[in-house]
Amino acid sequence: MIKIAHEAPLDIFEEIQTYTDYDYALVHLLEQNPRYRDAFERAIKKGREVILDNSIFELEEAFEPERFAQWIERLRPTWYIVPDALEDSKKTMNQMASWNLRYKDVPAKKIGVVQGKTYEQIKACYTFMDKVADVDMIAI
């Protein structure tokens, strides 16, 4: 089944929820904006499905893992995206392995993102996510 989500300005956040299946939170904005944080806390209390993103595109590198784990504990999203490395399959796989050792008990479903620059790198990263990483979902 295809699900729809849209990032939305806070002023129309609740209206947008009437058109979407889940909400997509950027972790760095949870720290920066109390209104943003409150909106997602309310969404979770209402039973909305929420994905917590590590803000890699916005920050150009993934949010710091320890702080990210703390936000997962605090927010309790449905899903979270493990910190990855843009277009870097080896670093992404290493970060996933490290995450799995240090944060195996965080409360939510885990999404692993496939990264790489070449077909072979992307294929290797996908295989790692599928066979080794113990993720609940793979994102490409």
Please tell me what each predicted stretch does:
Residues 1-95, 99-104:
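Non-catalytic, usually N-terminal nucleic-acid engagement modules in DNA/RNA processing proteins
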Residues 84-86, 91, 108-140:
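Glycine/Thr-rich beta-alpha phosphate-binding loop at enzyme active sites
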